[in-house]
């Protein structure tokens, strides 16, 4: 039976509803259990009936159809996922529930429920699970859908135009989209689940509670930043738990940390991967600069040198910067003390810049991606070299020459589209009563899929519940746009893609 991809995804999420249902039974929350159990049953029944009616239908489109499925998943699936959430809470609107599910599915983690204690434990588990499945969905889609179409960052290194596949040049080697999707899923799903399980066990060993540990483990792997206790600063695992999570955050820097299925420029080794190297440079470079500022600020006020405070400050900066670079958004428990010690009262611009830069291509991280930043860096370096030596010839290899020329051009196009999207969304939010500064933060948070920026980037946290309904829908659009990226949306509108 050949079921459409959207139905398969719907069925997976319907089955996943029984996990919080079972958990709610175990904690004697029968009302919440019924909400998720019956929603899962209804979903499976609908998937079965629709599947039987379209079982023998041969899909007309290959890769373009799957790209359309990605868009439909992020837009329409939360309509179903929000039903048990609203029914379990009973004190929130359906729009708020839909917003929360879009935020979780796109791994943004924009928390519309400002008080964690307001939600039942099983609802916290459900939100983290939706984000975790959304992260797995993007892991698989990046390799099986976006890479063959030269989208999602792969347009920087591939020979084909964005939205077109290299396989078009060789019709005999055109891959079967469905078969590729199955192969990628069977290869990556066990890795994703195993890493999450390992992180969960390590957090429990560090002293964290089972529910909080599994929610944080899923949030780290999906880079969603969702927490049942409002952040890791209140976690029982302490600095040991932060160190463990820091290691797993590195999976958001480069796909080579867990797979080599999308190697396109010949950098099959992690130490030669430009994304990982530039990510490590930022992760350690920015905290060192902040640490030096901390130290100089302490000397200026003649403060007593305290080594433990200095180390705590450095660790708080190191973890928080890594978290926001990978678009997770967790703040270290030592981040606030580091700000107070250094006098750094407004670190929002640093966090906004890190989130915009983003993580690696084909990871769960959002942003503009490190590979595009690297391509523009190479291009700028080459242009400065030509200014000094106009007759010089690039000594880089063929792969880097590709990045310097066409790759940098496509990366620059993406940056312009990102800036235009940021401008339009900010204007649209401002039109519905959101102050300009808050509109900018919300737009960056949505487009970079870094929801915790809403609380961390401004002087005071932004209350999403006070926003008008149209503003919430605009922010939902921004989150979907940030997850799929503008080039993918434009590719869907291209007649050449569907004609091919």
What positions do the PLM features span?
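Membrane-proximal intracellular helices of multi-pass ion channels
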Residues: 1-500
């Amino acid at each position: 039976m050949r079921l459409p991809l959207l139905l398969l995804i719907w069925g997976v999420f319907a089955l996943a509803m029984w996990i919080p249902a079972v958990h709610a039974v175990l904690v004697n929350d029968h009302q919440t259990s019924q909400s998720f159990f019956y929603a899962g049953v209804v979903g499976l029944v609908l998937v079965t009936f629709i599947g039987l009616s379209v079982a023998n239908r041969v899909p007309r489109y290959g890769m373009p159809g799957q790209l359309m499925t990605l868009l439909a998943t992020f837009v329409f699936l939360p309509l179903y996922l929000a039903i048990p959430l609203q029914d379990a809470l009973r004190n929130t609107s359906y729009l708020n529930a839909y917003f929360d599910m879009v935020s979780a599915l796109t791994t943004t983690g924009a928390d519309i429920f400002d008080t964690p204690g307001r939600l039942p434990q099983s609802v916290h588990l459900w939100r983290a699970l939706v984000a975790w499945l959304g992260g797995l969905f993007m892991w698989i889609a990046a390799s099986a859908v976006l890479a063959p179409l030269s989208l999602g960052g792969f347009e920087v290194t591939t020979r084909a135009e964005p939205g077109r596949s290299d396989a078009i040049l060789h019709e005999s080697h055109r891959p079967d989209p469905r078969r590729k999707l199955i192969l990628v899923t069977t290869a990556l799903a066990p890795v994703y689940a195993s890493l999450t399980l390992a992180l969960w066990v390590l957090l429990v060993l560090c002293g964290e509670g089972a529910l909080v540990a599994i929610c944080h483990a899923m949030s780290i792997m999906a880079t969603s930043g969702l927490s049942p206790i409002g952040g890791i600063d209140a976690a029982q695992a302490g600095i040991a738990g932060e160190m463990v999570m820091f290691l797993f955050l590195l999976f958001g820097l480069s796909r080579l940390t867990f797979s080599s299925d999308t190697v396109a420029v010949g950098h099959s080794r992690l130490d030669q991967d430009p994304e990982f190297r530039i990510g490590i440079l930022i992760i350690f470079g920015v905290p060192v600069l902040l640490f030096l500022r901390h130290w100089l600020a302490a000397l200026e006020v003649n403060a007593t040198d305290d080594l433990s405070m200095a180390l705590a400050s450095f660790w708080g900066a190191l973890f928080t910067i890594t978290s926001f670079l990978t678009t997770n958004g967790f703040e270290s428990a030592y981040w606030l003390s580091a700000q107070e010690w250094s006098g750094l009262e407004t670190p929002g611009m640093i966090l906004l810049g890190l989130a915009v830069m983003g993580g690696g291509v084909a990871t769960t991280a959002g942003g503009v991606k490190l590979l595009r930043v690297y391509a523009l860096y190479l291009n700028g370096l080459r242009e400065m070299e030509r200014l000094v030596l106009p007759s010089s010839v690039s000594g880089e290899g063929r792969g880097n020459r590709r990045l310097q020329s066409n790759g940098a051009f496509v990366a620059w196009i993406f940056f312009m589209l990102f800036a235009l999207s940021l401008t339009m969304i900010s204007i649209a939010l401002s039109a519905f009563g959101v102050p300009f500064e808050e509109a900018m933060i919300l737009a960056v948070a949505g487009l970079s899929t870094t929801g915790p920026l809403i609380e961390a980037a401004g002087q005071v946290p932004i209350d999403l519940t006070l926003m008008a309904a149209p503003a919430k829908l605009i922010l939902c659009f921004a989150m979907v746009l940030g997850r799929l990226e503008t080039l993918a949306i434009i590719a869907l509108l291209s007649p050449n893609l569907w004609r091919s």
